[in-house]
Amino acid sequence: MSNISRQAYADMFGPTVGDKVRLADTELWIEVEDDLTTYGEEVKFGGGKVIRDGMGQGQMLAADCVDLVLTNALIVDHWGIVKADIGVKDGRIFAIGKAGNPDIQPNVTIPIGAATEVIAAEGKIVTAGGIDTHIHWICPQQAEEALVSGVTTMVGGGTGPAAGTHATTCTPGPWYISRMLQAADSLPVNIGLLGKGNVSQPDALREQVAAGVIGLKIHEDWGATPAAIDCALTVADEMDIQVALHSDTLNESGFVEDTLAAIGGRTIHTFHTEGAGGGHAPDIITACAHPNILPSSTNPTLPYTLNTIDEHLDMLMVCHHLDPDIAEDVAFAESRIRRETIAAEDVLHDLGAFSLTSSDSQAMGRVGEVVLRTWQVAHRMKVQRGALAEETGDNDNFRVKRYIAKYTINPALTHGIAHEVGSIEVGKLADLVVWSPAFFGVKPATVIKGGMIAIAPMGDINASIPTPQPVHYRPMFGALGSARHHCRLTFLSQAAADNGVAERLNLRSAIAVVKGCRTVQKADMVHNSLQPNITVDTQTYEVRVDGELITSEPADVLPMAQRYFLF
């Protein structure tokens, strides 16, 4: 039997079981847990390579082979870190395993034929497309910015650069909901809209759900009262949608205990649960201890750095229509920004007590940095806190699974879309992000949307090869024309689907219905289900978890930062 060195094998086919890969310039290392390809039968495309007629490519018709295969990919997902080929058919994941020609090769689960395209993923990492559940639809250009960061699904609300949308993620009322669904029909990402949940009588909420929203947003700027919270959750239970909450910073209509009483044990997604983005001051962070609370962070406080506190005051004044010349407005802003709770937030993520990350796009958050900042937190916690107790080897595999779940499977579960997106699993939409390890989490090599390349770095269009400078991210065919409608999903409530909203609005994109929004619990948050006892000292703002003081040091240097953005 012929032998090949590990290094030569990795150079040719990518890493295999036992090999380790560094993620970007962080201190995070992953180790390959399993290899679903077959040694000696690996497929690879190119001159003199395997995927040729009668060799790795068979004679079957299109119906019997995949449309796309990603060869020798290193999959990083909540369920594992595995080397495999990934087959895609009709825009969905067909199989994860061994690609090739079943007529002459063993163990083939992904048949390659004349109808099959190849993306070479040797030496590359492949992740599921990210999901950002805190989108202020201030401008449509956010979709492309999100896409080039590896986010393929955007959930939120708004109508454009209006004062209401600058501050809140609400698309209010049937007319705006209809117009936003029509506008978003041409965006190259999956979308779901949130309606305005701030009313105390149910009919105004029911009509928004019937018009097409997949959730209701309760925001303090519209009045986050116990009555509004109870009403929104009552309608949500009735119509199987999610409720997202930005609670009452000023404690005007009650304290965190009153809000929890109004929630009454029902499932709810609490936005920026640390509090700098808004919520009961100073102790909204304690909500994440409850079994029905699905807590998320927005990215301006992630990770905690020397600049975090100074940056926040001006951001808050702009986004929430506050006047720096009014003392009460300044006091309101300052009450939300607490060094101690921000310092605790990173640790709560590392413990798995906070379950999701998101952006708060153009409204105190950066739409293109959800993925990047999530991994910066993971790096900071590795450096400050060392290996997690759950790790089973000399690697960071468990920590990596915990953090990737925060922007993939957990937001999908939270908003009832996990049957369609959120992980690399058979049957789900083929929203896949391909990364070179050195650029992991920062700049994707390719973003695949519904089985087609939607955006990718591309060199000089007049060059003789695709790689000469200047290289820019450019929309690809999966984001153009009517092809995009076959490669994306518009999420609707069951009531909207039954109401014929897609047909009435002439939506051309595929429609998917949210489900299971009311039964999901904190315990269902993958790798992020911890429910500790959390207390906040109302005088010092110190945070304690099960009696232990929780804090972290502000970062003065971060990975995945300036060195990646010089050009």
Curated annotation (Swiss-Prot):
GO terms for biological process: urea catabolic process. This is Urease subunit alpha. Its cofactor is Ni cation. The gene is ureC. It is found in: Cytoplasm. Substrate binds at H219. Ni(2+) 2 binds at K217, H246, H272. Its main location: cytoplasm. Pfam families: Amidohydro_1, Urease_alpha. One of its GO terms (molecular function) is nickel cation binding. The modification N6-carboxylysine is found at K217. PANTHER family: UREASE. GO terms for cellular component: cytoplasm. Carboxylation allows a single lysine to coordinate two nickel ions. It is an enzyme of class 3 (hydrolase).
